[in-house]
Amino acid sequence: MSLSGASDKTSDSPDVFQIKIGFIGAGNMAFGVAQGIIASGKVPPSNIIISAPSMNNLPRFKEKGVSVTHSNHEVVGGSRLIFLAVKPHIIPQVLKEISQEVTKEHIIVSMAAGITIATLEELLPAGTHVIRIMPNLPCMLLEGALLLSCGSHAGEQEETLLKTLLGPCGLVEFGPESWIDAHVGLSGSGVAFVYVFAEALADGAVKMGMPSTLARRIAAQTILGAGVLLRDSGKLPAELKAEVCTPGGTTIHGIHALEKGGFRAAAIGAVEAASERARELGNKQKKN
C-alpha cells in the first residue's frame, strides 16, 4: 500500500500538498470539510477520495474533482488521512471492516458525535493516530466552527496538519475531549437554536405587519451582521448589547420582554440538553 505524504513533516510544506485524504461517508459534514480542504489550496482535489454505499451524495464531490468509490477498502488503501463521516451507530461496523488495513502511518479523524476517543482506539490497531473533530453545518459555506481533540497517539504534528487543512472551513480550535459534548450543544445543535430565534424574530415582525418574506430576509441579515460584529469587534456580548440599549429606548424594552420570557435560561438549558444527549449517545456506544 502506498501512502503518499506519509512523512512526519506535517507543517505547511510540499509534503502536505502530496498527502492523500479519504472520507468514509458523503453527507453534508463531509462535503463541508472536503470543500475547506480544497479551498486551503494545500491539497489538490485529485488527492481526495470519498466512499459511500450509494451514488446519492457523490455527484457534488465529483463536481469538485474528488474521486468517488463505493469501497471503504479503496479509501483506506489509498489515503493517509481518513475522515470517518458516517452516523455514530455505523462507526463500529466501519472500523471492524477496515481495521486490519489501518497502519501506524494513518491518521483517523472521527466526525461522529458521542463516539469517544477511547472507543475509537479500542476498535483500531494499537498505536493508531486518532483525532475527534466536531464540525457544524456552516462548514458547508466555509463559515463553520470546529473543535478538535487528539487521542493518546496523536499530537502536535497532527494538530498542525489539520489546522493547515481545515482553516478555510472556519474557526478551528483544539481542546480536551471533555469539551466535545459541550461543543455539540453550543455549535452543532446551536445552529438550529439560532434558526429558531431567527424564525421567532421574523414572526414578531409579521405580527407587527411586515410581509413574511421580507421579515425572514431581514432576520437572517440581522443575525449575520450581529455575528460578524461579535466575532470581529473583540468585545463581549454584554458590551455590544449595552451599545444598542439606549436609556428608555426600544431595545431595553425588548430585552426586558425576553428576560420575562426566560430567554436566557431557555438558551442555557438548550445547550445543556443537547450536550447531555451527546454524552448519553456516547455512553450507549460504550455499552454496545
Swiss-Prot record:
Key words, A-Z: Amino-acid biosynthesis, Cytoplasm, NADP, Oxidoreductase, Proline biosynthesis
Keyword Hydrolase carried by entry: no
Gene Ontology biological process terms in this record: L-proline biosynthetic process
GO cellular component: cytosol
Catalytic activity field: L-proline + NADP(+) = (S)-1-pyrroline-5-carboxylate + NADPH + 2 H(+); L-proline + NAD(+) = (S)-1-pyrroline-5-carboxylate + NADH + 2 H(+)
A GO molecular-function descriptor: pyrroline-5-carboxylate reductase activity
Job description of the protein: Oxidoreductase that catalyzes the last step in proline biosynthesis, which corresponds to the reduction of pyrroline-5-carboxylate (P5C) to L-proline using NAD(P)H. Proline is synthesized from either glutamate or ornithine; both are converted to P5C, and then to proline via pyrroline-5-carboxylate reductases (PYCRs). PYCR3 is exclusively linked to the biosynthesis of proline from ornithine.
Pathway membership: Amino-acid biosynthesis; L-proline biosynthesis; L-proline from L-glutamate 5-semialdehyde: step 1/1
Similarity-based family: Belongs to the pyrroline-5-carboxylate reductase family.
InterPro entries recorded: 6-PGluconate_DH-like_C_sf (IPR008927), NAD(P)-bd_dom_sf (IPR036291), P5C_Rdtase_cat_N (IPR028939), P5CR-like_CS (IPR053790), P5CR_dimer (IPR029036), Pyrroline-COOH_reductase (IPR000304)
Protein name: Pyrroline-5-carboxylate reductase 3
Keyword flag Secreted: no
Name of a matching Pfam family: F420_oxidored
Entry-linked Gene3D superfamilies: NAD(P)-binding Rossmann-like Domain, ProC C-terminal domain-like
Quaternary structure annotation from Swiss-Prot or TrEMBL: Homodecamer; composed of 5 homodimers.
